[in-house]
Structures are given as C-alpha cells and as structure tokens.
C-alpha cells in the first residue's frame, strides 16, 4: 500500500487488465498483501477489515491518495480519513488496525509469498508458474498475459 510502483500499476495497468482479460473471463485476479512497512500493513488491515463490497473502492482510494496519506504528519489520522471517505467510522478503522488476528494473517501472507514463490519486493506478479518482479509498462504486461491465455 505504500509502494509507489504498486500505486502506478493499480492506476495505469490494472484497469486495462480487468477490461481486456478479467471481464472477458480469460483470467482471474487474486490480490495478496505483501506489506513492506508498518503503514502498508495497517492500510492493508483497514482494507481487508472493511466489508467485502467496499474493499475494491478502498484500495482505489488508498492508491490514488497514497502520496498524501504516506507523507502526512499523522498517518493514522490520514488513514482514518480515507476510511471515513469509504464509509467506515473512525472506531471501525481503529478496530481493524488493532485486530491482531487480521494483522497476523496479512503478515503471514507476506511470509507465505516469500517462502512459496520467492517474492521479496513489490509489485510482484504470478502469471501461471512465472514470477514477474517490478512494474512493467502495459505493452509488456499485455504480451505476457496474452501468452498466458494462449
């Protein structure tokens, strides 16, 4: 959630993937959290703790407002403000940020990604059995996906 390249992917590449491959039923997307710092962990907890119908919209706001909230003097207050924009009360956001089971699950997801797939940085992608590290421009990403769907 604090990775600039992840925000760029989410903003510039993900909508194209959804339109061309996911909406047509050719591919399925699965997001796994891989927080690299405490604020990424907390932002992921807020998103994962939100009602399922708000998850995608909350991710959208977190990535679009990333520079603003990650550079805020009070990052926790900035996260709560984003939560409010997504319809979550400050108390609800606070509960997500203190939910040990949720935080542990996200941290374990990161460890699993590292252990099972060798993921050590963000963004990283698994396309079939191929691991891609780092941001790729749309033409390169599109070529990989086109090859994967045959």
Residue spans for each PLM region:
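Structural alpha/beta surface segment adjacent to cysteine/selenocysteine redox centers
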Residues: 2-84
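C-terminal cap of thioredoxin/glutaredoxin-like
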Residues: 14, 81-150
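Short pre-active-site segment immediately N-terminal to redox-active cysteine/selenocysteine motifs
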Residues: 1-2, 121
């Amino acid at each position: 959630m604090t990775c600039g390249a992840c925000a760029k992917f989410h903003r510039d590449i993900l909508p194209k993937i959804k339109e061309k491959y996911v909406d047509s039923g050719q591919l399925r997307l699965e997001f796994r959290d891989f927080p690299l710092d405490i604020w990424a962990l907390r932002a992921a907890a807020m998103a994962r703790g939100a009602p399922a119908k708000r998850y995608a919209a909350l991710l959208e706001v977190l990535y679009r407002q990333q520079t603003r909230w990650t550079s805020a003097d009070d990052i926790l207050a900035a996260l709560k403000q984003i939560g409010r924009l997504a319809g979550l009360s400050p108390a609800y956001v606070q509960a997500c940020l203190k939910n040990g089971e949720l935080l542990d699950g996200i941290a374990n997801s990161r460890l699993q990604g590292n252990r099972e797939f060798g993921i050590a940085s963000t963004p990283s992608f698994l396309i079939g059995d191929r691991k891609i590290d780092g941001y790729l421009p749309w033409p390169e990403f599109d070529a990989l996906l086109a090859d994967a769907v045959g």
